[in-house]
Amino acid sequence: MQKSTEQAGEWQEIWERRGALDSFIDWGRTTYNHFFRRVLRRYLNTDSTVLELGCGRASLTLSLAPEITSLVGVDISDVAVQQASEFAREHHILNATFAIDDCTKLALTEKFDFVWSQGLLEHFEDPIVVAREHYRMLKPGGTALLSVPYRYSYHTLWYLLTRPKMLRRFWPWTEQRFFNGRQLLAVGKEVTPYARVFFLHPLPLGIIFLELRRPVTE
């Protein structure tokens, strides 16, 4: 409980903070969302029910909300949940709801066709616990997709360069790890044999995906 409380406080501070660096991050997120949408649309249709874990402002999934049946977003930060909810209201998106929840032990009882997270898994000491929660939320035949920064990319270099205390403010997120393909697949295989990894193209974007598929019958 203490660890979850500490983590909630860290992310609360991140989502409340605004500045020049955060404006740059917003621009980068908009750029990445263009490529993420191409990937997510492979999994979605008008009947899809979608859950986003660690949704933040949910800018990506809200942009896809008109193309699906429903969207539920959860985050440990009430500031992030409030911002996502306000964005949905302002843009008259009626099929999206947001709630505060802990991605290591979700209170949700509903199951979904598609479970998504963007830049979430790498912030946890035990990523397998979080990956299992993604899988647990799936309907039979559903798919979970988790995106993380690739270990051998500019993301890692940026992180390492900002480790000195005086430069720490130039890394806008909490502490994290970086996965290569083998390590990320090992996490997935602890959850289900129906796991695979693949890269976001173009490769210089430095993003790798973990896909977890739930069989129709188990």
Positions of predicted regions on the chain:
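Conserved N-terminal segment of class I S-adenosyl-L-methionine
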Residues: 1-107, 114, 118, 131, ...
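S-adenosyl-L-methionine-dependent methyltransferase catalytic module, highlighting the catalytic core
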Residues: 22-31, 114-116, 125-136, 143-218
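Short conserved AdoMet
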Residues: 45, 65-69, 125, 139, ...
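Short glycine-centered segments of the SAM/dcSAM-binding site in methyltransferase folds
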Residues: 49, 142-143
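Short amphipathic alpha-helical "recognition" segments used for binding
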Residues: 56, 61, 122, 126, ...
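A short linear boundary/processing microfeature
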Residues: 87-90, 140, 163-164
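Active-site micro-motifs of SAM-dependent methyltransferase domains
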Residues: 105, 122, 153
